[in-house]
């Protein structure tokens, strides 16, 4: 994977889990140098002290769970949807049939899933200052499918659909 998670990430997702909501943790991008430091054998999660963090990225690396509770709705407008650090109730994810496998490659698959959840009445809560994960630097994936995926997301938003046809059900007995 391309993420290094805070040792208490799962605990944070469990602590903040609420029925009728899915959780979005924070993804903090690391630069090339910080990635090398994090991948060193002696490295541990350094949180806000991690090298290569500046400005807002350093601020997001502070773990302050009590503050997270106060900001979980307001932070939705600050933190983008990123499926690399989300928490769902199993029944909610099954109800919308998970990720739409019609989407190919990079782009909008996470936004499309969240749109279906919200269309189904499941609300997003952002865990700012909790559920922290660092994204390791690497060459970007091909954006060749981005426009087609974005069109699928827009159609989900426009139509209000809550389920996809090509999802988890394909893999269940």
Predicted regions and their residues:
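Short Asp/Glu-rich motifs
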Residues: 32, 112, 136-138
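A short, conserved alpha-helix in the catalytic core of glycosyltransferases
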Residues: 81, 85-97, 103-123, 128-129
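Active-site donor/metal-binding and catalytic loop motifs
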Residues: 127-144
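Terminal low-complexity segments of carbohydrate-biosynthetic enzymes
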Residues: 84, 92, 119-123, 145-173
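Short, flexible, basic/aromatic active-site loop/helix in glycosyltransferases
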Residues: 42-79
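Conserved hydrophobic/aromatic beta-strand scaffold that supports enzyme active sites
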Residues: 22, 85-87, 133
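Conserved donor NDP-sugar-binding/catalytic core segment of glycosyltransferases
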Residues: 2-54
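Short low-complexity, flexible loop/linker segments enriched in glycine and/or proline
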Residues: 37-39, 116-118, 140-144
């Amino acid at each position: 994977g391309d993420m290094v998670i805070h040792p208490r990430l799962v605990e944070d997702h469990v602590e903040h889990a609420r029925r009728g909501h899915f959780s979005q943790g924070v993804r903090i991008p690391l630069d090339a140098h910080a990635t090398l430091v994090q991948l060193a054998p002696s490295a541990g999660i350094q949180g806000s002290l991690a090298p290569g963090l500046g400005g807002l990225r350093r601020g997001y690396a502070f773990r302050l769970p009590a503050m997270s509770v106060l900001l979980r709705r307001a932070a939705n407008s600050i933190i983008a949807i990123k499926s690399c650090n989300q928490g769902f109730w199993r029944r909610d994810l099954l109800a919308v049939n998970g990720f739409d496998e019609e989407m190919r490659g990079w782009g909008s698959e996470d936004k499309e899933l969240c749109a279906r959840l919200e269309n189904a009445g499941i609300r997003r809560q952002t865990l700012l200052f909790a559920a922290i994960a660092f994204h390791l630097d690497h060459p970007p994936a091909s954006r060749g499918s981005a426009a087609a995926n974005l069109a699928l997301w827009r159609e989900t938003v426009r139509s209000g659909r809550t389920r996809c046809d090509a999802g988890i059900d394909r893999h269940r007995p």
